Design a protein with these regions (language model features):
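Extended, histidine- and acidic-residue-enriched regions that form the cofactor-binding/catalytic faces
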Residues: 1-109, 113-251
Length: 251
């Protein structure tokens, strides 16, 4: 297995050498927002960075520092929330891509832990294709529905994951010291008729900030799902890089 090549701990010479070996960089994207009373504000950052670190180890890609803020409008009035506007996050992604492309990065991988960041990833990737001809691939827990159906016991709240069995199980694998299971509660708030068709805020629906049942979370479930995510994302990274090289050769 490869040693993880983390930007924050590397010198300029080490980065130059690493880019020469495998010109792929991973940018984790997260958010700073409430996750109930049993999980910390940084869940989305921590999970994205944890998954990204394992993928970097598996593939040899360089690991960029995580973006700690995302689009968190729905929790804007709850203490601890820090939210970026979507176009600001898109601009951050693009600026990072322009920066790393200048010294040889050929493929940027976005690993996201916060679903509301997905639009920003998509539009940044499209614009970067036009501006730099740089391939950008992006992930938000690929195969999530199938893996949850296989490994989780509780239902989601209308397909949403937030402070639920899924996220709590992953936290129990990667950061168990930051999980307070004794404070975990299940909550499935009533869904307003105009939810998804108006500016109804999630922050107004759940008393606990939980959507689902984190009390059913276990380390074993988290391990099985995490291993699957690492396998899927790592395979896609290698495939995307091979395609990039074939395109360069005109194959």
């Amino acid at each position: 297995m490869n040693t993880v090549k983390e930007f924050r701990y590397m010198t300029r010479d080490e980065v130059e050498d690493a880019v020469g070996q495998f010109p792929v960089a991973i940018l984790p994207l997260g958010a700073t927002e409430q996750h109930g009373h049993h999980l910390p504000l940084g869940v989305d950052i921590m999970l994205a960075e944890g998954l990204a670190r394992l993928v970097a180890k598996e593939t040899g890609a360089l690991l960029l520092p995580a973006v700690p803020f995302g689009y968190s409008w729905v929790w804007r009035d709850i203490p601890g929330t820090v939210s970026l506007q979507q176009h600001h996050l898109e601009a951050v992604i693009k600026d990072v891509a322009h920066s790393v492309s200048r010294y040889g990065i050929e493929l940027l991988v976005l690993i996201n832990g916060h679903e509301a960041n997905t639009s920003s990833m998509k539009y940044a990737a499209r614009e970067l294709q036009d501006e730099l001809a740089m391939p950008v691939i992006y992930f938000f827990y690929p195969g999530l529905s199938e893996l949850m159906a296989e490994h989780c016991d509780s239902e989601t709240w209308h397909g949403m994951i937030h402070a639920c069995e899924f996220e709590t199980s992953l936290m129990l694998v990667m950061y168990p010291e930051h999980v307070q299971m004794e404070k975990a509660v299940a909550e499935y708030p009533e869904r307003p008729p105009l939810y998804g068709k108006s500016s109804v805020s999630l922050g107004d629906l759940s008393e606990s900030g939980v959507y689902g049942d984190p009390t059913k979370a276990t380390e074993e479930k988290g391990r099985l799902m995490l291993d699957a995510f690492v396998r899927i994302v790592s395979g896609n990274v290698k495939e995307a890089f091979d395609m990039t090289r074939k395109k360069e050769r005109g194959a």
